[in-house]
Each structure stands twice: as structure tokens, then as C-alpha cells.
């Protein structure tokens, strides 16, 4: 293995760049729909050796000394994000005449920007680089910090954080309840990088042993949480809500077509909602439709509310995604919100919640005046774009069920599970992944949603237009669901309700403690204070 390490360390020029990009791209096999987490062992082993060879002239300034390492990290990240996010281009092809020109920006431009975070992670690690296991601790700390920054800088976009590669199944998700997805990311990089120590021998015994212990603890805690830890007491049989998830699989082009029969789309949802339970099951208490499932402004269409009332029984509730319009007075443009409505059996809207975290260039246009003059517009055609709600609040349903609402990609942000979530007993995620067709995107989105359930300790009710719709318990296990591309409905019983984790602060604290510990290991190793590390 030392010979292989030497060859990688010494590779130069175009071959070096190609190897870095390839290592990043190969790591994507650890993500859904593949879930081959072992791929990241090879990718990060190669990355460590490439960083070992990222030398600069001693006479160079700080930036000059760190530039080769930054370049390696950027190339690795570029390969990772191109291979992991290429499917974003599918959304632009829904209206190809209008947006096909932006394909290079989505497929290459966004990955190039996101790769900067990985370049900075490697450059930061290079500052603490040593010959022993300290270098993989430094790399883990660098990636943990930069993945966290990626989730908060500008509007944030933490999609496909490295840690998800170490969480393909519920057994391997449970650590996120303690240290969060970003904490798992830091530990994952340490574990995935450990085989690189065999290539240089120094610190191999200590470093690999620690990595094995961390991986064993990761699995051990997962087994404890799934099979040994106490679970919430099940609700009495007659108190268990039955939730119907409606998945109409409406083609996105049809949803955007102004000439489409919107009533037909609406009736498709009503028909699936009205069908009798299968196998003699209980009728649903709660019926859920996906994001923007109501194809018109509901408050302007009393006939639609009447049709909903005709479909529902008096004791049933409909939760549906819709566009909400808010009149702001004479001479002021109408504001539009991506919203969730709760409608009772009489056709009355009894609760609503608006989306807080909007998708840039999809739901609103940054620097709108400038970009509009250049002919650039939102992918979603709403006059003036969507407005963001100032805050998120619970949807309190009759019977004491409090849902924490998250629309579309809001569920990928770990640090946004705040505020009223302490009073929630389930997460609600409405989305429309039909934008991305039969690509890896919806599978990646679903994994991140399941990890949010684990982090918060709350069951997840997720409804998607084209899939994946599912009821997920607080351990990330799928209770019932509909796969990508299926049309129909599924009735699922919520057996128990969780009180959750209270807030994100314990996880954030443990994440920063993990970062501090990794940096301490890197510093100690660099100074040679512990035998066998250098």
C-alpha cells in the first residue's frame, strides 16, 4: 500500500487533477439511490494522499503555501458535486425553451461554487498537516466546519453533506440524534480517511484503531437506539391517527401549463382522497396532499372549498400545499406565499403556514431588479416571485396533534429545527420532486428528511407529488410509503407520538465539541506529544 500511496502522492499535472475529480465523483456512490458507503473509503484515502503531495515552495506566502491544497480540495469537491447534483438540470428542462440556456450554470456553475467549501476545508486542514493520524483529524475538522458553513452562508445549501454517506440505513443514522448530521460528517471523514494511514505507516496503528472504535460506536449506538432504548408508549388503539398520503404523480409540465385543465388536476387529488380504505382498514383521520397541489388560489375559489367539504367526512382533516395570495392594499403588489392549508370537513381553512426558506432563482430572484433587466426570471412563474414568511409556527390539529411544517427543501437544514419544535410531536414535509423526474435527486432528498426525523426524535409525515411519500418513525424507519413514480395513496397509522429533542442546541454543542476534539488531536499529533502519532 505504501507503493500505491507514493504513486498517488507523486502524480502531477493533468493526471493529478483528473484523479482528484474522479475521487470526488466516486464518493457519490455512497449516496442514494446507491448507498454504497464503502466508496468513500477509497475516495478519502486518495484525497489524503493527494494532499500529502500538495507541496509548495517554502518561500511562498501563506496563500501560496495553501493554494495547492485548496486546488486539490476544490477539484475533489467539483467532481463530488457534479456527480451528485447533475439532476438539477432536469428542472430547467421542464420549460426548456425558457431555461435550457442555464443548464451549464446548474450542472457546472453551482458545483464550482460549492466546491470552494471543500477547497477551504482542505486548505484549513493543511495548516495542521502532519505525517501521522493528526492529518486525518485535521481533514475531518475542516470538512465539519465547512459543511456547517455551507448550510448557513448566503441562503445555505447543505445538500449531500459527506455525513449522509455514513447514514444509508437507520442503524447508521442514530448518531445524528446526538451530534447532528454535521457532527456525523466530521466523524465520517475521519473514519473514511483512516485507510490512508497504511500508505505512510506513521500513526497507522493508533489512527486506524481510533477509526475502528468510532465506527463501532456509531453502529453500537444505532443498535442501542433501535433495539434497546425505551420508546414512547403506544397510543390507545382508538386514539391512533390514520394518515392518508396522496401521491398523484402529476407531470410538472402539466402543473406549469397555463392552458392545462386545473380542475382535472384538482379532481385527481379528490378522487384519491375519497377512495375507501384497503383491506378493511380504518378511514383516515388526516388526508395529506403534496406541495402546491391545489392548482389555483383557494381563497378565491369557494367552489373548490365546497368540493373539499363534499369529499371529506365531518371528522376528517385535509392538509394541502397551495399558493396563498395576500392583498396588501391599493397600489401595492399582491404577495404570494408557498403555503400549507389545514381544512376541516366543513371546507373551512382552520390553520395555515407559509414557507420561510425560499429557493433562490426558483421561488425568488436575488438582485431582482438587475437580473430582470438582463432577462432572467424565476423558474416558478409567480408575479414578483414568492415572499418568505417571517417565522415558522406549528400547525395545531384537532385532537392535540402538533405538526412542525417544512415545505420542500426546508427539511434539509438541520439548524432550522428551532422555535416551536419543542412543542411538536411530528414533522410535516410537503414537497414536489416531480421537477427532478426519475433521477437521484428525490432519493437524496428523502434520505435527508429521514435524518431530520432522527435528529429531532420526531416521526415524519412526508407527502411528495411524484414520490417519495412516507410515514417515517423517529428512528428514520419507513412505516409505510409510496416509491418514486407511483400514483396512488397509502394509509398509515401513527402508533406513537414523540416529544422530540427540544431544540437543536444540544446537537450543536456536541458538534462543536467534536470539532474541538479533532483539532486538539491534530495539534497534538503535529507537535509529536503522543508516541506513535508522528
Curated annotation (Swiss-Prot):
Record pathway: Protein modification; lipoprotein biosynthesis (N-acyl transfer)
Xref: InterPro entries: Apolipo_AcylTrfase, C-N_Hydrolase, C-N_Hydrolase_sf, LNT_N
Membrane-crossing segments per the record: 8-28, 31-51, 69-89, 105-125, 127-147, 178-198, 208-228, 511-531
Subcellular location: Cell inner membrane
UniProt membrane topology term: Multi-pass membrane protein
GO MF annotation list: N-acyltransferase activity
Domain CN hydrolase: 246-496
First-level EC class: transferase
GO cellular component term, pick one: plasma membrane
GO biological process: lipoprotein biosynthetic process
Pfam families named among the record's database cross-references: CN_hydrolase (PF00795), LNT_N (PF20154)
Record's function text: Catalyzes the phospholipid dependent N-acylation of the N-terminal cysteine of apolipoprotein, the last step in lipoprotein maturation.
PANTHER family: APOLIPOPROTEIN N-ACYLTRANSFERASE
Family to which the UniProt record says this protein belongs: Belongs to the CN hydrolase family. Apolipoprotein N-acyltransferase subfamily.
Protein name: Apolipoprotein N-acyltransferase
Organism of provenance: Rhizobium etli (strain CIAT 652)
Amino acid at each position: 500500500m505504501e507503493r500505491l500511496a507514493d504513486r498517488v502522492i507523486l502524480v502531477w499535472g493533468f493526471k493529478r487533477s483528473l484523479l482528484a475529480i474522479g475521487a470526488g465523483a466516486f464518493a457519490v456512490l455512497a449516496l442514494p439511490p446507491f448507498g454504497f458507503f464503502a466508496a468513500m473509503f477509497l475516495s478519502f484515502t486518495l484525497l489524503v494522499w493527494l494532499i500529502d503531495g500538495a507541496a509548495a515552495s517554502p518561500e511562498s506566502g501563506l496563500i501560496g503555501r495553501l493554494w495547492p491544497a485548496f486546488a486539490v480540495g476544490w477539484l475533489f469537491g467539483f467532481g463530488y458535486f457534479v456527480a451528485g447534483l447533475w439532476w438539477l438540470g432536469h428542472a430547467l428542462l421542464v420549460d426548456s425553451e425558457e431555461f435550457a440556456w442555464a443548464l451549464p450554470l446548474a450542472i457546472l456553475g453551482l458545483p464550482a461554487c460549492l466546491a470552494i467549501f471543500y477547497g477551504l476545508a482542505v486548505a484549513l486542514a493543511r495548516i495542521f498537516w502532519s505525517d501521522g493520524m493528526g492529518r486525518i483529524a485535521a481533514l475531518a475538522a475542516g470538512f465539519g466546519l465547512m459543511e456547517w458553513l455551507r448550510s448557513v452562508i448566503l441562503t445555505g445549501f447543505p445538500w449531500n453533506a459527506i455525513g449522509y454517506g455514513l447514514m444509508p440505513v437507520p442503524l447508521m443514522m442514530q448518531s445524528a440524534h446526538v451530534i447532528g448530521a454535521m457532527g456525523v460528517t466530521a466523524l465520517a471523514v475521519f473514519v473514511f480517511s483512516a485507510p490512508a494511514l497504511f500508505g505512510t505507516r506513521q500513526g497507522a496503528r493508533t489512527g486506524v484503531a481510533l477509526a475502528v472504535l468510532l465506527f463501532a460506536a456509531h453502529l453500537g449506538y444505532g443498535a442501542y437506539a433501535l433495539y434497546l432504548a425505551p420508546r414512547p408508549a403506544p397510543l390507545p388503539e382508538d386514539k391512533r391517527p390514520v394518515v392518508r398520503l396522496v401521491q398523484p404523480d402529476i407531470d410538472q409540465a402539466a402543473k406549469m401549463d397555463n392552458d392545462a385543465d386545473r380542475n382535472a388536476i384538482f379532481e385527481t387529488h379528490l378522487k384519491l382522497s375519497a377512495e375507501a380504505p384497503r383491506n378493511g382498514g380504518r378511514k383516515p383521520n388526516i388526508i395529506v396532499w403534496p406541495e402546491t397541489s391545489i392548482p389555483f388560489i383557494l381563497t378565491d375559489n369557494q367552489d373548490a372549498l365546497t368540493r373539499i367539504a363534499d369529499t371529506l367526512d365531518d371528522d376528517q382533516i385535509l392538509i394541502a400545499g397551495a399558493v396563498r395570495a395576500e392583498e396588501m392594499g391599493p397600489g401595492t403588489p399582491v404577495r404570494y406565499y408557498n403555503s400549507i392549508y389545514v381544512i376541516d370537513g366543513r371546507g373551512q381553512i382552520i390553520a395555515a403556514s407559509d414557507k420561510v426558506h425560499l429557493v433562490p432563482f426558483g421561488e425568488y430572484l436575488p438582485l431582482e431588479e438587475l437580473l430582470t433587466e438582463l432577462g432572467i426570471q424565476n423558474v416558478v412563474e409567480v408575479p414578483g416571485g414568492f415572499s418568505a414568511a417571517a417565522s415558522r409556527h406549528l400547525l395545531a390539529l384537532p385532537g392535540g396533534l402538533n405538526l412542525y411544517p417544512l415545505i420542500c427543501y426546508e427539511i434539509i437544514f438541520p439548524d432550522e429545527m428551532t422555535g416551536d419544535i419543542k412543542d411538536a410531536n411530528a414533522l410535516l414535509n410537503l414537497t414536489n420532486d416531480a421537477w427532478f423526474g426519475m433521477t437521484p435527486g428525490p432519493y437524496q432528498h428523502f434520505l435527508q428528511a429521514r435524518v431530520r426525523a432522527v435528529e429531532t426524535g420526531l416521526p415524519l409525515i412526508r407527502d411528495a407529488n411524484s414520490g417519495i411519500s412516507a410515514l417515517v418513525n423517529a428512528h428514520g424507519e419507513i412505516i409505510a410509503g409510496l416509491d418514486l413514480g407511483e400514483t396512488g395513496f397509502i394509509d398509515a397509522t401513527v402508533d406513537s407520538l414523540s416529544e422530540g429533542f427540544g431544540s437543536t442546541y444540544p446537537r450543536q454543542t456536541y458538534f462543536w465539541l467534536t470539532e474541538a476534539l479533532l483539532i486538539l488531536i491534530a495539534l497534538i499529533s503535529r507537535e509529536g506529544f503522543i508516541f506513535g502519532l508522528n
